[in-house]
Amino acid sequence: MNEDRKNRESGKLLYCSFCGKSQHEVRKLIAGPAVFVCDECVELCNDIIREDLQGSEAGGVEGLPKPKEMKAILDQYVIGQDKAKRILSVAVYNHYKRLKARTFRNDVELAKSNVLLIGPTGSGKTLLAETLARVLDVPFTIADATTLTEAGYVGEDVENIIQKLLLACDYDVEKAEQGIVYIDEIDKISRKADSPSITRDVSGEGVQQALLKLMEGTVASVPPQGGRKHPQQEFLQVNTANILFICGGAFAGLDKTIRSRSERSGIGFSAEVKSKEENTNVGEILAGVEAEDLIRYGLIPEFIGRLPVVATLEELDEAALVRILIEPKNALVKQYARLFEMEGCELEILPEALGAIARRAMERKTGARGLRTIIEHALLDTMYELPSAEDVGKVVVDAKVIRGETEPHRVYRSVERQRVSA
């Protein structure tokens, strides 16, 4: 600045070092060490930087898998549930588009869209959330709603959910603030009665109240490295405004609530008469769920308002369970075949056995989650003896093995051993 003053006092004309304009052609000329820059060049530089930042953020959106691409990846791991996959893909894409495509304009603020998954046990709720997190390469954690209680009571505080998310990304706060949290068994924190209770419900309505701000967006104080809270401790501050919450639950009995509402709305001369056998598919009934049904089930209106996107999953039939056994990338049959291959043996599960496994899972009402248990039980003795057995080239499983009527058939490499076993 002293040099600028000297130049002015000496009557020397000054020029911008970038555009070459004189001090009389611009509003302001800023002096640096042996250089000058005018206000017009400063404004131009700001515009270039702003456009570059917007372009890089737009490029981030381009880097996101599009909804169709997300669904295609989900199809590789989860069988069926097309409608739920579409809803989830769009919701997750819009959520991360909201984060990555932030502009400098403040005229429209995009709200967060958390997701509620409703479906029977073993229909793929958790697997959908896990696969999405893997596709997007973001921190992911699963929380069990049944262990949560209000602060000050025995059980886990809701802040523990964020602590688990931090643990999943080595306590990188910036990464955690863009993660996904899946809260399982969310139906188990429903209010114990339709009307508010005069007694304190610390594991039901109380937990719903505690989750409200966390899901909407707040700054949660989390003890570093999983320590317990005490007054002299420094806390990690985690903003949950950009964390996507996906809540899932079986909501047993919700179909009856929906059916009773539908029957009430159809009273009168214009009511359509339906037989009791009609519309017995639980998945079809759940697809018609409304906020009123969830409130009657025990969720408070404020909590439902934090979950604007609702996806329902269908009950898996026998054909879908058979496909789950053989089609996904990590299908159970492929997993067990790999285990047997590591012992130098081939595993063949016949189509009739696949059908028997699916039927047994349906009888137990465990969905896809029960398939592994059935296969494990059928192959337990074989897997126990196989590492010590010699010359076993192949193990064949048929429907009788699944029903427990016989042992898996062993095929030996040598003809003599085969005759002995026969």
From Swiss-Prot:
GO molecular function: ATP binding; ATP hydrolysis activity; ATP-dependent protein folding chaperone; protein dimerization activity; unfolded protein binding; zinc ion binding
GO CC terms in record: HslUV protease complex
Protein name: ATP-dependent Clp protease ATP-binding subunit ClpX 1
Keywords: ATP-binding, Chaperone, Metal-binding, Nucleotide-binding, Zinc
Entry-linked InterPro entries: AAA+_ATPase (IPR003593), ATP-dep_Clp_protease_ClpX (IPR050052), ATPase_AAA_core (IPR003959), Clp_ATPase_C (IPR019489), Clp_protease_ATP-bd_su_ClpX (IPR004487), ClpX_bact (IPR046425), P-loop_NTPase (IPR027417), Znf_CppX_C4 (IPR010603)
Annotated HAMAP family: ClpX
Positions with a binding annotation for ATP: 120-127
Biological classification of the source: Bacteria, Pseudomonadati, Pseudomonadota, Gammaproteobacteria, Methylococcales
Positions bound to Zn(2+): 16, 19, 38, 41
Family stated for the protein in its record: Belongs to the ClpX chaperone family.
One GO BP: proteolysis involved in protein catabolic process
Domain ClpX-type ZB: 4-57
Protein purpose: ATP-dependent specificity component of the Clp protease. It directs the protease to specific substrates. Can perform chaperone functions in the absence of ClpP.
